């Protein structure tokens, strides 16, 4: 089956941390997209040397469902010298682009165990922001959102995560590796996760973002007897083209 492709138009492009911008695109043709919370899309981008490049970005929309959505929101971090980074960071509202998708399996399953750990570093929390409305209604499961960053100023969507964490069954753990701040864990997400005593009998984990973090946490969970199916992973690997 052909992969759906969409023409989208950039609506807003604003900095939300010193290194991350939030971009909102309006669907132009077709006018809507249906996706599952946790999925990503891929952009085909033109470059100066004429060779198109493909880059993927997680859908960060916070909606009750992903049916017939008319817009797509992304959070994109700047990579020094990165082709897509330059393009997105300098894109003006009104710019048209092509994207395909949605792709990916980092989605909440029908059946969930007692506890779900949602672990992300940097823009790797985008899929979890998209899952917020689902978390609200799935009251039989305890959710732990672990957001890792170096400094507090590198974090975003904090109001959304804190708001959902007002519910008894949702817990938000901001983790800072380079500074101490009230209300934040000092250290890496790995260390916070270890403190929560993950148990393969009762828990599953979702890992997203920096490939090294994903590998490290996966190894830690395997040492605690988690099976491959109990750890869902999305690595933000760099593209070779
Ligand atoms: C499934 C998936 C979902 C993704 N979702 C997001 C998302 O929601 N938000 C987001 O910001 N990114 C996301 N990414 C990463 C994104 O697709 C690009 O890889 C990223 O934007 C860098 O592209 P670029 O063209 O700017 O850099 P490139 O031109 O690809 O790279 C430039 C140079 O920087 C190096 N490099 C590339 N990325 C990094 C990095 N992160 N850290 C250090 N060095 C790097 C490369 O090796 C290269 O030397 C995702 C990736 C995948 C696979």
Question: Regions from the language model: what does each represent?
Answer:
Residues 121-125:
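Ser/Thr-glycine-rich phosphate-binding loops at phosphate-binding pockets of nucleotides
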Residues 117-119, 206:
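Conserved beta-strand elements of the Class I
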